[in-house]
């Protein structure tokens, strides 16, 4: 199971769905703009 849009995530263990990024400053799944 991957994490969807705006789910809290761990930048060191990114489990976001494909197409999303997890940044240390913004620790939630979001589009890579």
UniProtKB/Swiss-Prot annotation:
It comes from the Eukaryota. Changing residue 11 to A: No change in potency towards Nav1.2, Nav1.3, and Nav1.7. Changing residue 5 to A: Important decrease in potency towards Nav1.2, Nav1.3 and Nav1.7. Expressed by the venom gland. Changing residue 6 to A: Important decrease in potency towards Nav1.2, Nav1.3 and Nav1.7. The record marks 28, 30 as: Pharmacophore key residue. Changing residue 27 to R: Increase of Nav1.2/Nav1.7 selectivity over Nav1.3. Changing residue 26 to A: Important decrease in potency towards Nav1.2, Nav1.3 and Nav1.7. Changing residue 31 to A: Important decrease in potency towards Nav1.2 and Nav1.3, slight decrease towards Nav1.7. The modification Leucine amide is found at residue 33. It is found in: Secreted. Signal peptide: none annotated. Changing residue 27 to A: Decrease in potency towards Nav1.3, no change towards Nav1.2 and Nav1.7. Keywords: Amidation, Disulfide bond, Ion channel impairing toxin, Knottin, Neurotoxin, Secreted, Toxin, Voltage-gated sodium channel impairing toxin. Disulfide bonds join 2-17, 9-22, 16-29. Belongs to the neurotoxin 10 (Hwtx-1) family. 22 (Htx-4) subfamily. Negative results: shows very weak inhibitory activity against hNav1.5/SCN5A (~60% block at 3 uM), hNav1.4/SCN4A and hNav1.8/SCN10A. The presence of a 'disulfide through disulfide knot' structurally defines this protein as a knottin. Gating modifier toxin that traps voltage-sensing domain II of voltage-gated sodium channels in the resting state without significantly altering the voltage-dependence of activation and inactivation, or delay in recovery from inactivation. Inhibits hNav1.7/SCN9A (IC(50)=134 nM), followed in rank order of potency by Nav1.6/SCN8A (IC(50)=191 nM), Nav1.2/SCN2A (IC(50)=239 nM), Nav1.3/SCN3A (IC(50)=547 nM) and Nav1.1/SCN1A (IC(50)=674 nM). This is Mu-theraphotoxin-Ssp1a. It comes from Selenotypus sp. (Feather-legged tarantula).
